[in-house]
Structures are given as structure tokens and as C-alpha cells.
Amino acid sequence: MSTSLPLADRLNRPIGVLRLSLTARCNLACPYCCPDVEEPPGLLTLEQQIRVIRVATRLGVQTLRLTGGEPLLSRRLLPLLEAVAQARRDRSDPMAGLQAVALTSNGVLLSEPMGRALRAAGLDRITISLDAAEGEAAARMAGLQGGAVAGERLVRQVQDGIAAAFAAGFDPSRGELKLNAVIQRGINDDQLLPLAALARQRGMELRLIEYMDVGNRNQWTLDQVLPAAQMVERINARWPLEPLGRPRGGTARRWRYGDGAGSIGVISSISEPFCGDCNRLRVTADGQAFTCLFSAEGTDLKPALASDLQLEQAMRQLWQRRQDRYSEERDPAAAASTHAEMAYLGG
């Protein structure tokens, strides 16, 4: 087996994060994401998923994030976590180099038993997605029928999921439990303060994400983007903030509350792109590798999954060819380009 040093792409960006989607299905229907009802054909097996993770860590990946769709819908989630945890304990295994294993979920299925099982299986961090803290807006952002009643039910379910994660030992003060929210101007930007208040109750970091032109189903337009700077201004006017900056390779520029009640982060891929140090490789549930969230098509890894060596060669060549910097080159005035869908890519 190869023990090569971590590689870099054509813009000298190392590989550092593997985002592995376990499913394209979701139990919500958020309009900006537009998930598929059925899985794509040819899903990776558990053994193939483990091989992808092992080879990625050999190439330099230090963080594994499991995504969807909704990953809690995948029956392979717990077995995969357990296999990764076992490998991390073996110093001879490349996966021993993983510094963090994380999960992104909408939290609806995150019961107390599931929270304990995830923790016991070796999960280090959970990020829960909720785009509104009030009923009508929550239903709208999740694509639910039933208006405010359905939205209020969803918010309660997600709050229960947050409580379950907290009870399982995921500590917000150590960055182990965070809240994500996609913000659209004129759609849910009135939820900034309610979401911040909800996160502050638990001392969680709230990560605010600019509405992005990922996929082709969401009818994205630039005027629906609320720039991150304006999000920060609104929250700072209510609860004063102190800047923390953005770590190299990170997606979020962070602020902490002056009163100590947690922090916020803003992911500003539209208004302040961070392509220059992006270190993420995305692999879909059916084995397509994408070197950019805004890619039109991926590279099928399945033909290379016969051995670690073949897969390493394929992934190394893919990363060495990488020169994506879509967000820095985005031209809103140009005709809309084609992108893979958000739910398929796993965010």
C-alpha cells in the first residue's frame, strides 16, 4: 500500500475533508435542496464506503463528514461509524489519522436512543439543520404542507433532536453540536433573531449559510441572497458580537457573543468566496466524486473500487487535476450553468 504524502491540486490546495453522502433521500422537502424521492442506482456497499474513507485518509483527509439527503435514513450509518471507530483505534490503519468524524442531519429522527448510539459508535460532532424557529416559516423552508401547525411540529421535533444530542454527550462548548440555517432574503430572513435565540439557549454555534446556486431545481437568483455581512449586522444589533475570524480551510467566518452565550458563523460563498483554501472532496451515495459543490458532473469511483491501490490512483489523479474556483468566478449576469443537485451532493 502507498504511504505517499498528502497531495495538492493545481492551485496548491491540499485535500483535508471528505464529505460522504449515505443517501440522496430525505424526510423533508426543502425547496433550496429539492431532494429525490428515490435513491440513485448503484449505491456503494458498506465495504466500498470504508475503502473510500481509508484511501481518502491515506491521501490526507483528516475530517470525515457523513451527509445525505438525511443520513439518519441510512441503515448503514451505525455500522459505518462502528467500522471507522475500530479502524481509528488501529495505529497501522490510515483512518487512525482522522481527527474528527461528523454528521449533518435535520434532527427529526434524532431520538435519545439514536443520539446515544451515534455517540457510542464513535461520532464526534453533529450539525443540525433548521432554517426557521417559527411555525409558518419553518413549514415553508422545509417544504411541508399544513402551514404553521406543521412548522411548529417540525421545530419541536428538531428541538427534541438537539436535546437528545446534548443528553448523549455532544457538547456545544467544544464545537460538538452546532445549528445550520440557510437564509433567503424575503423568505426566511425574519428568522435570524429567533434562530439565534434558539441556539443561544443551548450555547450552540449558529451557522448561517448564504442561499447558493447549487442544483437546477431551486430557481436561484442573486436577489434572494442576503449577504453574510448583513446577517451579522442584524444579530450584532441585538446581541453584540466579537470577531474570531475564519481558520484556513474552514468555511465559516466566526463571531462570539460578548455576553458569552455561544457564537455564530457565516458561510458566505456568494458574497465572500473562500475557494482559495477549499479542501473538500465530496463523494455521493452512488460513488460519484465531486471536487466542487458547484460541479456539473462527478467522476465515477466504482470502476476503481476493486482495490485500495486502484482507488488511490483514481482519487489522486482526480485531485491533482482539480482547479475549481466556481464561487470566485461566478457571473450572475451570465446564463445559468448546470450543477448537480444539493441533496445528491450532500451539501
From Swiss-Prot:
> Looking at the keywords, is GTP-binding present?
yes
Residues reported to bind S-adenosyl-L-methionine: Y32, G69, S129, M212
**Ligand binding ([4Fe-4S] cluster 1):** C26, C30, C33
Q: Which residues form the Radical SAM core domain?
A: 10-242
The coiled-coil regions, if any, are none
Listed binding positions for GTP are R19, R65, T104, K178, R280, L281, R282
Q: Which UniProt keywords apply?
A: 4Fe-4S, GTP-binding, Iron, Iron-sulfur, Lyase, Metal-binding, Molybdenum cofactor biosynthesis, Nucleotide-binding, S-adenosyl-L-methionine
The cofactor note from the UniProt entry for this protein is: Binds 2 [4Fe-4S] clusters. Binds 1 [4Fe-4S] cluster coordinated with 3 cysteines and an exchangeable S-adenosyl-L-methionine and 1 [4Fe-4S] cluster coordinated with 3 cysteines and the GTP-derived substrate.
Q: Which reaction does it catalyse?
A: GTP + AH2 + S-adenosyl-L-methionine = (8S)-3',8-cyclo-7,8-dihydroguanosine 5'-triphosphate + 5'-deoxyadenosine + L-methionine + A + H(+)
Instruction: Supply the EC number(s).
Output: 4.1.99.22
The keyword GTP-binding is annotated on this UniProt entry: yes
Task: State the source organism's domain of life.
Answer: Bacteria
Q: Which Gene3D superfamilies match?
A: Aldolase class I
Q: Per its Swiss-Prot or TrEMBL entry, what cofactor is needed?
A: [4Fe-4S] cluster
Assembly, in brief, is: Monomer and homodimer.
Query: PANTHER family per the record?
Result: MOLYBDENUM COFACTOR BIOSYNTHESIS PROTEIN 1, MOLYBDOPTERIN COFACTOR SYNTHESIS PROTEIN A
Job description of the protein: Catalyzes the cyclization of GTP to (8S)-3',8-cyclo-7,8-dihydroguanosine 5'-triphosphate.
**What is the protein's given name?**
GTP 3',8-cyclase
Give the lineage: Bacteria, Bacillati, Cyanobacteriota, Cyanophyceae, Synechococcales
Q: Tell me the gene name.
A: moaA
